Amino acid sequence: SADDLRIENNERLNKELADSDFVMFLAYDVGGSRYLKGRQNQFEFISNNARLMEYTFRALKDTNKPFIFVSSQMANLSFSPYGALKVVGEHYARALGGIIVKLWNVYGIETDMEKSHVITDFIRKARDTGVIDMITDGTESRQFLHAEDCSRCLLTLAEQYNTIPRDKELHIASGEWHTILEVAEIISGLFPGTKIQPADCKDDVQKNSLINPDPYIREIWDPIIPLKTGIERVRKDMELEN
């Protein structure tokens, strides 16, 4: 398909880039913890992302377009194949002079349930079954950021593209740690009577690696949507989808 970035010499990609003023490189084969746990060690997952990056970065080089490459805070986790792939992407982006950002657990409405992240997953479970059955014990902590805050940050960076220092770490994060159990409790409060069932196992995708985000980006941007408000918005958006 012409929409498949894993295809070499994709004519549609070349045309779209040629017609663009600026490129946000967010495309990736990725999903939530459940998806990564099952896929990130598989050949196809690694191949999908390696090819997607090679051909897209080559097209960016050929068209010489300004761009932001969206990496992940998991690029700092050496045990993660997904993180290692993002590190390769960062090297590509650096070689071409683009901006590199690291996202921290961005959430919003999702339509592909196979790849859904924890907040969407918990809302769907609470709404449809009245039970939030977790895949971990919920003690792991995350920094959650609403997609609207993330989008505002990316736009700000694009607008200031030429003045953003390339040697700074740009971590797009909320700055607030919350456990997965806290998220479940917020969501169960939106659906009275919902039961929370933690599992016995610990998180083995990020292994609860509490590396704090670099604060530099706060000089040009601040998130404004609190977690509870953001979760309520996602719930309303999911109701509208139905």
Task: Show the residue positions of the predicted features.
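Rossmann-fold cofactor-recognition segment
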Residues: S1-E11
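Active-site loop/turn elements of alpha/beta-hydrolase fold enzymes
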Residues: A2, Y28, S72, L103-V106
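Conserved Rossmann-fold NAD(P)-dependent oxidoreductase catalytic core, especially the SDR/UDP-sugar
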Residues: V23-F25, R51-A84, I99
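NAD(P)-dependent short-chain dehydrogenase/reductase
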Residues: F79-G83, V87-R142, A147-T156, I186-S188
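Conserved catalytic-core motifs of eukaryotic protein kinase domains, centered on the activation segment
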Residues: S33-N41, L77-P81, T111-D112
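Conserved cofactor-binding/catalytic machinery of classical short-chain dehydrogenase/reductase
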Residues: N48-Y55, P66, V88-G89, H146-D149
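C-terminal substrate-binding subdomain of Rossmann-fold SDR/epimerase-dehydratase oxidoreductases
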Residues: A126-N242
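NAD(P)H-binding glycine-rich loop region in Rossmannoid oxidoreductase-like domains
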Residues: N10-N48
